[in-house]
UniProtKB/Swiss-Prot annotation:
Name of protein: FMRFamide-like neuropeptide 21
Residue pairs linked by disulfide bridges in the UniProt entry: none
Species classification: Eukaryota, Metazoa, Ecdysozoa, Nematoda, Chromadorea
Entry keyword set: Secreted, Signal
Family statement: Belongs to the FARP (FMRFamide related peptide) family.
Keyword Ribosomal protein: no
Disruption phenotype: Exacerbates bordering behavior, where animals accumulate at the edges of culture media. Enhances clumping/aggregation behavior in a G-protein coupled receptor npr-1 mutant background. Decreases locomotion quiescence, in an npr-1 mutant background, during the sleep-like state called lethargus which occurs during molting between larval and adult stages.
Amino acid sequence: MRLFILLSCLLAWVLAAPYIDQEDALRVLNAYLEQFGPGSDRVYYVAEDDHGSMKRGLGPRPLRFG
């Protein structure tokens, strides 16, 4: 349960961060999952960004009047 809460907080931090900070946050999340994940050698975690919109976080477009 604690792991789920921690991962949820980390994921929220990743999604709320600007693009450059997302890469750092994903590296932290990936390192955490590799260190504290299940003991099976066949389980691998990879967290990657889809490099979506680079304009995220700039706010709404301004209104344009005629």
